[in-house]
Amino acid sequence: MRISRPGIWYLNPYLSDTNREQLTQGNPNLESEKNHSFDLQFGSFAQKLSYNISVGYNFTDNSIQSFQKMVTDNEVAGLQNPTGKQVLYTTYYNMGKTQSATFNGYASWSPFTSTRLVVSTWGGYSHFSDGQGLKNHGWSMSVYAQLQQTIAKTWTASASVFKMTPGVNLQGKTMGYFSHTLSLRKSMLNDRLNITFTADNPFQKYYHIKSNSSGKNFATSSTIKFIPQSFSIGVSYRIGKLQSGVKKTERTITNDDVKSGGGGSGKTGGDNVGS
């Protein structure tokens, strides 16, 4: 069993009223999720080909889900100057019962010493229920691939793509996503100096994120448009020599049991599977 504590944005009682017709508020009374999972893995690691495959099943009886409903704004605690009109109110509850069957795959292939191909994929079928008749289910999948080629020893070119299908949540779904990256690295001074040119989504001028949500007496659809392109130059220089040796063990504590997310004004539904 894995316990996931709600992140600060889920707990924050601050009322986001930037859009007076779509209000969002955290819930400080949330409890930690209790997740149960079963996994089966198989892998092989060799010089030219390495891969790992896993299948799993997990379920949560008190999962944290965002929930939307239509209310009159004078019912919302903390709202300044209510008018009595209908608004879409979003908050979070331990109301979800989730079940997911998943598949993960990873492969790294080097047909030549100068060429490397990496592919990673995830897929799953999920079922959401609030225990009171509200249900949603569906498939989702993501694929990442990267091809890296060394040219004349000091030049390295790489291209990568990422594709994610639409994700589902308790009250709706979100649109899928696609991105691509090109990079070129030049190594000099015996690999001490590296200059990297990177282009993110150079062939995609605009991107639209769409989401749909529905409930009792309402249905919403939203679209966010933004420019995904970026171009950058990175320079790194290594000082000194790399030396092998015994490194003293450092004791650290890492808290990775926090469920992230939440906090978006007008957020349309709970955590998406596949996002």
Q: In which residue ranges do the predicted regions lie?
A:
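Outer-membrane beta-barrel architecture
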Residues: 29, 39-43, 52, 104-108, ...
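Transmembrane beta-strands of outer-membrane beta-barrel proteins
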Residues: 1, 43, 52-56, 106, ...
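Conserved C-terminal beta-signal and adjacent last beta-strands/turns
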Residues: 137-275
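Transmembrane beta-strands of outer-membrane beta-barrel pores
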Residues: 1-5, 36, 44-46, 57-61, ...
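Extracytoplasmic loops and strand-loop junctions of Gram-negative outer membrane beta-barrel proteins
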Residues: 19-26, 35, 83-92, 101, ...
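Surface-exposed extracellular loop regions of Gram-negative outer-membrane beta-barrel proteins
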Residues: 1-36, 57-84, 202-216
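Outer membrane beta-barrel strand-and-loop segments of large Gram-negative receptors
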Residues: 25-27, 31, 46, 50-120, ...
